[in-house]
Amino acid sequence: MDYIILDIEFNGRKFASDLPMEVIEIGAVRLNEQLQLIDQFSALIKPVYFAKLNKFIQKKTGILQTEIDEAERFPKVINDFQQWLAQSESCLFITWGGEDMKRIVLDTRMHRLDDQYFLHADYFDLLKGFIKHKGLVNDISVENALVELQIEADGHAHRALDDARMTSEIFKATFEHLDFSQIQQYKDSFTNAKERRLIKNAIRLLLSQKLEPTWPMFEEHFLQKTIKTDNPKKTAEIKQYFLEQMTKQKNDKTTD
């Protein structure tokens, strides 16, 4: 089995917008079972929306507008990428966090392409693995993880291929300490971290006031005021998360 260390860059925006963010660069390296680098993939992508990169993204990535203007669109690049992936009889994706798989799935859907390959692809979140191995509390960047491991960074941070290479060095250095029972597949999520934090805080507030946190109460006093729920799937996910967190916090309070 090969290991595909994946990194993507996407077009962030300074101001909020209803238009989707898009992948603008895919970088990946292929390691064999002996953790030797045997191949690599790199491609820029010309976005449909925000085709003109803002100054923040240009400064962060070093990607030039002329390079983006000359790049292929997502359907061509993702097809090339899947052909490159097919050279491995089997593979496990290694990512730093869960955003890379999410953005590829979302862009695949945006372009009305078949998303089944990436939905069923196994991946290991090296960020979580590294945090568990080192006993850390907060997330850490690839650059700081390299410092922690006393590995000299080689490349330009926030360029997909260079980040994939640097992530592969972390993977190799920590391989024997990683818990591969945590391999997962992409799961659709309609809420973000901020919204899930609001839910937990609301339950905590209700409990502190000696009130029973019920879904109707949360829906009336918190949900309608703080979270946009025009998607029924999102509402269902919020309700499920609320019920899980309510049970967890009540149990924690009982055992205190």
Roles of regions detected by a PLM:
Residues 1-61:
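Conserved RNase H-like, two-metal-ion catalytic cores of nucleic-acid enzymes
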Residues 1-19, 33-36, 69-92, 97-256:
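DEDD superfamily 3′-5′ metal-dependent exonuclease/proofreading module
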Residues 63-67:
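Short glycine/proline- and acidic residue-enriched helix-loop micro-motifs
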